[in-house]
Amino acid sequence: MSSTHTHSKKSQSLTKNQRIVLDLLQNSGEPLKAYFILYSLKKEGLNSPLQVYRALDKLVELGKIHKIESINSFIICNNSNCAKNTAFTICERCGKVKEIKNRDLTGGVSDLVKDNQLEITRYNLEFYVLCKSCKIN
């Protein structure tokens, strides 16, 4: 998957499969697994895992969605000013995922790369937390 993550102001041409996968993710408001997407969209004509994975890969490449690696799920990108790489919090109790953007965090990663003469092709930061609701209960 590509590390490019930009939102174009121009509407990019999406295939039918990409549009229906994107619509499902937008309407869900939560991370979805590929096989759940396949099951949910069979009536729309998506009949094979390959169709779903191709659509998901392209949507990630276009910066429309993110893959949450640790839970092997996909979520809509909610950050209109998103950078190349993004971080998430995942509640250990309820499973709620939140996209976060923090300049200090990304600056720290940039410093790490520079100090160690590395070239990051992409990164995916996932923090396991107790969300506000679960912390109270």
Show where each model-derived region lies.
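Short alpha-helical segments that sit at the start of domains
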Residues: M1-D23
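Short capping segments at the starts of secondary-structure elements
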Residues: L14, N27-K33
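Short amphipathic alpha-helical elements of helix-turn-helix/winged-helix folds
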Residues: I20-S28, S40, L62
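Short acidic, hydrophobic short linear motifs in intrinsically disordered regions
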Residues: P31-L41
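Short coil turns linking two alpha-helices in DNA-binding domains
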Residues: S48-P49
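Basic amphipathic alpha-helical segments that dock to polyanions
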Residues: V52-L62
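Non-DNA-binding regulatory cores of transcription-related proteins
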Residues: H66-K67, I71, I75-N137
